[in-house]
Amino acid sequence: MWIVLAFVLTVAAPAYAQRATVRKPPPAPAPTAPIKAAPEMTCPTPLGVGVTTKQTFCDVMAGRDPAAGILIKLPPHKGPVTLTFDLHNRHTYSEEQTKANRAYARYTATIGVLAMDNTLISRAVVQNEFRKARDLVDRIGGGAGPGGVKAVAPTGDEPITITIPEEEGEVSILGEKLAVDRIDGSATYSSPGRPIAVISNVMIEYRPPPPKPVRKRK
């Protein structure tokens, strides 16, 4: 009798242990959906608004101090931020030179996207040739020229995509150098304060940080 009872207890113990409830860890919160939006941007030298595209164009000036560049403030985010914009060259349009077939110019502009501690994140380049008025991206309103447009206009259109590291809360865009080839010769410009290029259509894509857990009241 004692042998049978001992056997039953031995067998029943593992069965009881198997019926014990195992608590699973709570599921990880789903990642927040990415947001694409126009960022908060400070443009120290606006070129103006396009007559046709209605886009706002901003001059990129040469310089070495990030605080003096085009400032793009990044909202709170989780992971890297994707910065996109259109990069253009600058052309001073002359109807007289265009009709005389003497308006040809080839532009190569190089700019940098920097962290606020002056660390270079990435460079971007736009190169194009101007021959006729159709090579302009748009005309800029608010000028004294015919039709109330400015002589300076964006030419060339290079879509740029830059990945901003997660730890950055603000970045700066500064011009590095501009190479110009014309009928009468070539020149390179890089002195601080000189316009190097133009940007437009600035956007960012980012994931907001996950919401903070709500503390339960005791």
Segment roles from a protein language model:
Residues K177-K218:
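Surface-exposed edge beta-strand/loop patches
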Residues Q55-P75, P80:
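Non-catalytic, beta-strand-enriched accessory regions in extracellular/secretory proteins
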Residues L9, Y16-M41, P210-K218:
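Compositionally biased, proline/threonine/alanine/serine-rich low-complexity intrinsically disordered stretches
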Residues T84-R102:
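Short amphipathic, basic-aromatic surface patches that mediate peripheral association
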Residues H77-F85, T161-D181:
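Noncatalytic modules at the cell exterior or secretory-pathway interfaces
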Residues G48-M61, I121-E168, V180-R182:
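Extended, solvent-exposed segments with strong compositional bias
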Residues W2-A12:
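Bacterial N-terminal signal peptides
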Residues E96-A109, S191-P192:
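Short coil-to-beta strand junction motifs in C2/discoidin
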